[in-house]
A protein has these predicted regions:
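Active-site residues of response regulator receiver
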Residues: 11, 57
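Receiver (REC) domain active-site loop signature in two-component systems and cognate sites
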Residues: 60
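Acidic catalytic/metal-coordinating carboxylates
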Residues: 35-39, 64-68
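Alpha4 helix (beta4-alpha4-beta5 surface) of REC/receiver domains from two-component response regulators
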Residues: 67, 87-104, 115
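Two-component/phosphorelay signaling modules centered on CheY-like receiver
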Residues: 14-32
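Active-site beta3 strand of CheY-like receiver
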Residues: 49-55
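C-terminal output helix
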Residues: 108-119, 125
Length: 127
């Protein structure tokens, strides 16, 4: 990858957030993290569509990941979204309803997240 991609990672579970940030920063991504959807939304508004991908949990306090994804797709349509969740029997239905570009069920291997991330980015960028 020649371009450094900017990622916003949002999860209310601090351990998961830290693990995702540590792993992906070692892969040469530019990482911004948020502990909840409202904080993530503030970063999005501040950066004015500078994030290439948002990775967000679906179930969070204040604003759900589903609502957040809907907002992202309306305000920042070029931003790719990966939804992650460990909740519910049909998380894909929630994420599909919110128009996530990809869904991953927790727990997942970090290498699978990286593979999905690269696949999404290659569909949009020449990498």
């Amino acid at each position: 990858m020649n371009k450094t991609f900017k990622l916003l990672i949002i999860d209310d579970n601090k351990e998961i957030l830290a693990a995702l940030c540590e792993f992906l920063s070692k892969k040469k991504y530019d990482i911004t993290s948020a502990n909840n959807g409202l904080e993530g939304l503030k970063y999005l508004e501040k950066e004015k569509q500078e994030f290439d991908v948002v990775i967000t949990d679906l179930i969070m306090p204040d604003i759900s990941g589903v609502a957040l994804i809907s907002i992202i797709k309306k305000r920042f349509p070029d931003t790719l979204v990966i939804a992650i969740t460990g909740w519910g029997e049909h998380p894909e239905a929630l994420a599909t309803e919110a128009e996530a570009d990809h869904v991953m069920e927790k727990p997942f291997e970090l290498s699978k997240l990286e593979k999905s991330l690269k696949k999404l980015l290659s569909s949009k960028f020449d990498i």
